């Protein structure tokens, strides 16, 4: 293409994404837009087409972002090129959202006509506003009997401050209002700015590993043009590669000769090493590089840590490969090797939240067929010692001796919880039970309230979300952001079996709830550990102090079975002999903790 053709094409490009709270109908709307623009034949169409991972379809949530190119003939008779970038809605995956928004100029904000605005809707809108996107509100599910589009329209104006007078009333399921949405995209979303003659700048917003083609980078071209055969350089790592193919997704990968300004597509350059393409990096030409890289995304810091161990220790290397490949398109995952006496070799991994951790575990078990054991999730604590030093602890087994600790600080989050009036009491109770501090309460309208609390992250990590959902019949929605560290009375609790510490069961807990938590764990282990030939004490300790104890009784053979009547001293002798043997066994015996016992303790509720 020459310069004029490129400029004409650029003026017809519209890059947009769809943002919404979980379950407000985002993936269904994406399906309808694909149908309307004839991206697929009827035969290829299936529900939630862009959710390509099995896990996404099973759970009905979007985890990874997806990009797709559509051609649309608008009412003004012109052909437009639309790039739809699908995003997840769950709080753990906001970084996926911020990545896809950085590649767009506009966003469709989908709000459920029955439920109205939820916490995640707000969080994603603010991300979109930070990226200066044009936001088009769409009120979805208007065919529901409980829909109240006018109330929701008012809510969008009051709560978010967007003009919703032209908001499209739609039903993605019934296919109502889809054309209107497409027309608004064409009219209101600006065409990409940028110059195809400038030095090349492409933003990598995702990447995949293909065993035949190496690493495939998903890119958005901001300036310049990239063709097959070009030598390109990654600006963060300085590595250079020759481009082997470029193309776009029309859901299927379709090869092209070149990608130019505003295009969203993929680039392969037989990149073998996973570490050479960082998400958020800028690609430029090796011969005529751009002066500076694009503003990437900030590196996300993991909030939750846990140990992952292969059940079969021979698969340790497979687990490392699996983590490396997943890290490639999951930039928020971090991991480093660690060992445990109870579980052998494994990795300490950092995640954004519990859902992220669960999804990752499942992906490893499914995609790489590795069975895993996970240790209890923990957060990063700051420990200040009496000698004036301080250290960072993300693993309970690294906690120093209680005598040397001056104070411990833990991360706190500011949680905004949106909830119907009827459940305010229940939510406040949960937050107080989780050591939350009440900050603020605001009424959104007559029926809904936003509660703001400061809560320790370690309490949220555990089962906060489940409790919130189950106590509000699923109506509460919640979003949180880190606000920093504050001192807390925290202690490390160890579990001893037969007076030997089991490192994988140690955890850090608040002093006030230590006794209850210890008691529950000890009882749980008593049920799950099989009886031995000798009696096994299970103790929960803080430092040298035992706070809870329970005993697994020994199995014993009836040694008196062969005595009929007769003298007590004969029986005594046999019983003493048995006792002696049990004592000897106890001093040398070790207790195996079965897999189920680990799992049960880690999944344990506080209640």
Swiss-Prot record:
Domain tr-type G: 11-193
Keywords assigned: Cell membrane, GTP-binding, Hydrolase, Membrane, Nucleotide-binding, Protein biosynthesis
Superkingdom of source: Bacteria
SMART domains cross-referenced by the UniProt entry: EFG_C
Membrane topology classification: Peripheral membrane protein
Record-level GO BP terms: positive regulation of translation
InterPro entries recorded: EF-4, EFG_III/V, EFG_V-like, EFTu-like_2, G_TR_CS, LepA_C_sf, LepA_CTD, LepA_IV
Residue positions binding GTP: 23-28, 140-143
EC number assigned by the record: 3.6.5.n1
CDD domains reported in the protein's UniProt record: EF4_II, EF4_III, LepA, lepA_C
Keyword Disulfide bond: no
Main location: membrane
Compartment(s): Cell membrane
Enzyme class: hydrolase
Pfam family, one: GTP_EFTU
Reactions catalysed according to its record: GTP + H2O = GDP + phosphate + H(+)
One annotated Gene Ontology cellular component of this protein: plasma membrane
GO molecular function: GTP binding; GTPase activity; ribosome binding; translation elongation factor activity
SUPFAM superfamilies cross-referenced by the UniProt entry: EF-G C-terminal domain-like, P-loop containing nucleoside triphosphate hydrolases
Family matches, as PANTHER family: TRANSLATION FACTOR GUF1 HOMOLOG, CHLOROPLASTIC, TRANSLATION FACTOR GUF1-RELATED
NCBIfam families linked to this entry: lepA, small_GTP
Similarity-based family: Belongs to the TRAFAC class translation factor GTPase superfamily. Classic translation factor GTPase family. LepA subfamily.
Its biological purpose: Required for accurate and efficient protein synthesis under certain stress conditions. May act as a fidelity factor of the translation reaction, by catalyzing a one-codon backward translocation of tRNAs on improperly translocated ribosomes. Back-translocation proceeds from a post-translocation (POST) complex to a pre-translocation (PRE) complex, thus giving elongation factor G a second chance to translocate the tRNAs correctly. Binds to ribosomes in a GTP-dependent manner.
Protein name (record): Elongation factor 4
Organism: Bacillus anthracis
